[in-house]
Amino acid sequence: MKMKLVTAAVMGLAMSTAMAATDATSLATDKDKLSYSIGADLGKNFKNQGIDVNPEAMAKGMQDAMSGAQLALTEQQMKDVLNKFQKDLMAKRTAEFNKKADENKVKGEAFLTENKNKPGVVVLPSGLQYKVINAGNGVKPGKSDTVTVEYTGRLIDGTVFDSTEKTGKPATFQVSQVIPGWTEALQLMPAGSTWEIYVPSGLAYGPRSVGGPIGPNETLIFKIHLISVKKSS
């Protein structure tokens, strides 16, 4: 988080707090409504991020600065406080991220250990697992080939994070341009096949988070229907 953004967010929330403290029920003008809306949005963000602040102190700081009154803290003191806040927040976020990564790795490994013993599940040397739902009889793609597929991706808890059903049309891409688990599985699939693949985190996105519901070290499940293969020239 950039220091200027932190400062702006704090100042913005302080301004809205000051306005609300003056007259909590008076939202007669567009300026009042805008101020309240900004304050509510910032307040929700602070709450969601676990940032603990004193609204009254923020309001006091805003009022002092806007009125030209003597500030209760020096510029250096405020800079030091904000720097410490930023470092503490980053440390907290890093600890939370690492904890989540460890938890996801343990859960994923436990899932794969149990899943490999289920009927029809094949385990490859890489750790990738798959189950054939429908066997096609078409050509198998190579790394440089282009495929058209329908798919649904979900987490091991069943949460769907992506699906061609949402877009209403299949996806087309080069086999080498997807996560390693997909690249490996697709090269084994004859066109026309439908497989369910179980992708260890190391063959998916690894320890990084790609946003949305996919966290670090997530084991992913995909149901893939390989519609067609376009061989590279």
UniProtKB/Swiss-Prot annotation:
Its main location: membrane. The keyword NADP does not apply. GO terms for cellular component: cell outer membrane. Residues 144-233 form the PPIase FKBP-type domain. One of its GO terms (molecular function) is peptidyl-prolyl cis-trans isomerase activity. Residues 1-20 form the signal peptide. Transmembrane segments: none annotated. It is found in: Cell outer membrane. One of its GO terms (biological process) is protein folding. It catalyses: [protein]-peptidylproline (omega=180) = [protein]-peptidylproline (omega=0). SUPFAM superfamilies: FKBP-like. Its EC number is 5.2.1.8. Belongs to the FKBP-type PPIase family. Essential virulence factor associated with macrophage infectivity. Exhibits PPIase activity. This is Outer membrane protein MIP. It comes from Legionella pneumophila (strain Corby). The gene is mip.
